[in-house]
Amino acid sequence: MDHLPIFCQLRDRDCLIVGGGDVAERKARLLLEAGARLTVNALTFIPQFTVWANEGMLTLVEGPFDETLLDSCWLAIAATDDDTVNQRVSDAAESRRIFCNVVDAPKAASFIMPSIIDRSPLMVAVSSGGTSPVLARLLREKLESLLPQHLGQVARYAGQLRARVKKQFATMGERRRFWEKFFVNDRLAQSLANADEKAVNATTERLFSEPLDHRGEVVLVGAGPGDAGLLTLKGLQQIQQADIVVYDRLVSDDIMNLVRRDADRVFVGKRAGYHCVPQEEINQILLREAQKGKRVVRLKGGDPFIFGRGGEELETLCHAGIPFSVVPGITAASGCSAYSGIPLTHRDYAQSVRLVTGHLKTGGELDWENLAAEKQTLVFYMGLNQAATIQEKLIAFGMQADMPVALVENGTSVKQRVVHGVLTQLGELAQQVESPALIIVGRVVALRDKLNWFSNH
């Protein structure tokens, strides 16, 4: 992050703009809206500045840049068409430890001005860090179309109710649940937009009188195979509403960065052959936190119901009467194969696909005879340590030794690596790959040479 987004309280604080043209006028308008005590220093001024000065809204200082004007300032903007003057303003501000924006020169500035969506008191700022102002403007226009004009009225009304909410609801969890009901109430929003005070009061009283659901809940969310762009919209909504997120090592840092900032995070990383936290203890963590009335998200790589032990976790909650729901995710087989250019089914090569765990319970055995059948694709999860056995068993039960195989490491991420060969090489290839990795076996693997789009590795 090259710039820290902040919102400045400038009301009744001295600010300086150097420049008297159209660009300076746009900056001045923003500072005046923010309530700043504004001084504008320039050789000449466009008429709007004179209008503002005559109305007592700002002070004009005609002449060359006078750096003593910075002595009482909190913030400065250099908006002339002379790069040398702009640099002088920046240097003078820097020497006084005053933040200075230099128009169209982000490297010379100590702060930049974002594109703004104003639904006061709700403000949304969009910035490209000065690298692409046009992109920031396009995003702002998109957001403008998505955010209702009356959103500011809703936010302002919420501010009026804060003391009452704090008095009526004792815990942060209760208050958050109330506000969630408040902000999704379309009738209230429309009544505020229509200035229908009677309807606003009636809806408000109904919201305060309705009992809150004090029970906690658990939501199993599939995070997908790695690329944060593959997280579903519903999954994103859930992790941004969570009180606590219980996650494993297959959840990428990019996805964890999307979690609500003040949510508690509990790492229960697991991998085949090693469990940081035993499964039964994970079950109890989910149960214990939900019984405290918290909204718990169990965030799992891939899909929670495909070799994710999600069913076991939900059984514990079901027996305890804890409400739960499931948000599916893109499973590793689908994501990794797509990002490797390997279609799992193809009318010429595979009429079915089998998802198989390579990590069996002690004494377990797979149906190797059916797995070795023709015209299908096999995808082994957690199979690296068993790769040599998989190779041996499939050949022993009749699969052709030259059957194409691929191993996908860190699938769908920028670190994705794919090694491929034939079945007789599977055990050897597995030595070149680190977990997390997926094994794909089938004629469709040969299509990778033509269909690989994501990586040349």
From Swiss-Prot:
EC nos: 2.1.1.107, 1.3.1.76, 4.99.1.4
NCBIfam families named in the record: cobA_cysG_Cterm, cysG_Nterm, PRK06136.1, PRK10637.1
GO BP terms: cobalamin biosynthetic process; methylation; siroheme biosynthetic process
Binding sites annotated in the UniProt record for S-adenosyl-L-methionine: 225, 301-303, 306, 331-332, 382, 411, 437
Name the record gives this protein: Siroheme synthase
Subunit structure: Homodimer.
Modified residues (Phosphoserine): 128
Pfam families xrefs: CysG_dimeriser, NAD_binding_7, Sirohm_synth_M, TP_methylase
Hydrolase found in the keyword field: no
Stretch list, region Uroporphyrinogen-III C-methyltransferase: 216-448
Keywords: Cobalamin biosynthesis, Lyase, Methyltransferase, Multifunctional enzyme, NAD, Oxidoreductase, Phosphoprotein, Porphyrin biosynthesis, S-adenosyl-L-methionine, Transferase
Impact reported for residue 385 to A: Abolishes the dehydrogenase and ferrochelatase activities and reduces 10-fold the methyltransferase activity
Residues given in the record as NAD(+) binding sites: 22-23, 43-44
Molecular function GO labels: NAD binding; precorrin-2 dehydrogenase activity; sirohydrochlorin ferrochelatase activity; uroporphyrin-III C-methyltransferase activity
Pathway entry: Cofactor biosynthesis; adenosylcobalamin biosynthesis; precorrin-2 from uroporphyrinogen III: step 1/1; Cofactor biosynthesis; adenosylcobalamin biosynthesis; sirohydrochlorin from precorrin-2: step 1/1; Porphyrin-containing compound metabolism; siroheme biosynthesis; precorrin-2 from uroporphyrinogen III: step 1/1; Porphyrin-containing compound metabolism; siroheme biosynthesis; siroheme from sirohydrochlorin: step 1/1
